[in-house]
Amino acid sequence: MRIEDFTQYLLWEKKYSPHTVEAYGTDLSEFEGFLVSMQAPAEDASIDFQAVRAWVVHLMEQGYTPSSVNRKISALRSYFKYLLRRGAIRISPMMRQGNLKEPYRTTVPY
């Protein structure tokens, strides 16, 4: 995976906050580690929807909240959009992966 190139792109070209860039980099490194642990191909063009879906399921089983998982999905979605624009991949594995539903929060007035 081209995580370093992507984070530099976010920082210098897209002008993302350093905290966001660090979080996205961490999320992508975690995903790459998951692929390695599952003995799945970690090359950008070889990553498919099933690998992404397996990671999302793994995160939920680890107790992550839907909002935390959605942030990680957002990092992957941005990464694969970056690769598409650079011509490194032809199809994004994120095309079928939507965000998780989050519980509706209501505020009670005082």
Describe each PLM feature range:
Residues 109:
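Juxtacatalytic substrate-recognition/specificity segment
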Residues 4-19, 25-106:
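N-terminal core-binding DNA-recognition domain of tyrosine recombinases/integrases
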